[in-house]
Amino acid sequence: MINVFPVRAFRDNYIWIVHNQQFALIIDPGDATPVLTWLRQQKLQPIAILCTHHHHDHTGGISLLVQKFEIPVYGPASEKIPGMTHPLAEGDTLVFPELSLELSILDVPGHTAGHIACHGQNRLFCGDTLFACGCGRIFEGNAQQMFDSLQKLTDLPDETQVYCAHEYTLDNIRFARAIDPDNPELIELESNVEEKREQNMPTLPSSLAAEKATNPFLRCNQPAIIQSASRYAGRQLTDPVSVFAAIRDWKNNFRGNTDLPM
């Protein structure tokens, strides 16, 4: 049996450790220090590093970890990942016998040009593509790419557990409620998340079913989202990609409920 543990780093990063009683897979190690501390405390042997994209807060700890453990580094083939030994692209499958774990690789460009996600055993490690109630900023791709990447993730089973790389949930919910204020599942989620954050507990993993019900970026064909996006854009939007682009731009500039278009 494997477990997934969130090692916290920086202000709001989660470095996910997939492990059993002996071995560990390290996902997106932006900082080696908290990872080393946790591995030592748990007496675990790391077997590999897996990175979803090249941003430093996901890769900054690789060099020290590789220096200490001499383990392989997996990452997107089209991005410069420090020390990468195994470049990956959609269609590749990773097998870690020590963990009885198999992961399928998906290309999910948008946040970065070569961003990948990994799915296996009803777990999705999606880096900065999909967040709980949100999605990543579009730095290197375009709205169409990001929309397509998110739609690809929605094709996974509803019971999939979503392990994103940042604790953005509460801020994302506040934006989602500005767009979709009457969504009862969103209102309930906000209450549950506020309670967890008051106790300094992670709000992750989410589930794909929950995201489909509450995440505006996955619901761009829904009337409430279309209406709010059109009000923000100042014109009637008729296709989901335009709706997505509008609410992504809105989120980039969102400062609170006072931003709700009149």
UniProtKB/Swiss-Prot annotation:
Lineage: Bacteria, Pseudomonadati, Pseudomonadota, Betaproteobacteria, Nitrosomonadales
Catalysis performed (reactions): an S-(2-hydroxyacyl)glutathione + H2O = a 2-hydroxy carboxylate + glutathione + H(+)
UniProt GO MF annotations: hydroxyacylglutathione hydrolase activity; metal ion binding
Oxidoreductase keyword on record: no
Protein family: Belongs to the metallo-beta-lactamase superfamily. Glyoxalase II family.
A GO BP annotation: methylglyoxal catabolic process to D-lactate via S-lactoyl-glutathione
Record's subunit section: Monomer.
Signal peptide (from-to): none
Annotated pathway: Secondary metabolite metabolism; methylglyoxal degradation; (R)-lactate from methylglyoxal: step 2/2
Official protein name in the record: Hydroxyacylglutathione hydrolase
Gene: gloB
Enzyme Commission number(s) of this protein: 3.1.2.6
SMART domains according to UniProt: Lactamase_B
Cofactor field: Zn(2+)
InterPro entries: Clx_II_MBL, Glyoxalase_II_hydrolase, HAGH_C, Hydroxyacylglutathione_Hdrlase, Metallo-B-lactamas, RibonucZ/Hydroxyglut_hydro
Binding site for Zn(2+) 2: 57-58, 128, 166
Keywords: Hydrolase, Metal-binding, Zinc
